[in-house]
Amino acid sequence: RVVVPAAAPVAALVKQVTRNWAGNPLVLDPRDMASEEFTATKRAAFRAADVALAASGTVSLELAAVNTPMVIAYDMNWISRQIIGRMLRVDTVTLVNLVSETRVVPEFIGANCRPGPIAEGVLQVLRAPGAQKDAMALTMQRLGQGGEAPGLRAARAVLARM
């Protein structure tokens, strides 16, 4: 089953676009529940997923935190592609790839964000979901999962610089 956690500003559009999709996808709409309930439901959906197709950004860290293999896809308008393409100095934009210093999470960014290649990327991840597990674990370890609270780590880092 397809589950789509939608952001509040686009939830109505997501519901409209997915209304006639095969399999009757479930759209999680944050406007329909309390913030804590939405967050818990979204995390449960992430945890239960065989694979996630996600936009680039912090969602890749949310997926890594629950060990869910992913494919990243994100497009932007032409002028943004041109500007950002000239500014980027890295060969990946996915946080899991950057933090783990790997390239195991497939990315379809800008002009490469097309249905055919994305679908093939999702199928490849479904065939070999374990390929991302080590990178996700390393990412979470480097970000301090299971260690001190983030606020305490940040305070210690600031104090160490003083």
Kindly give the residue locations of the regions a language model identified.
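Nucleotide-activated sugar donor-binding and catalytic core shared by glycosyltransferases
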Residues: 1-162
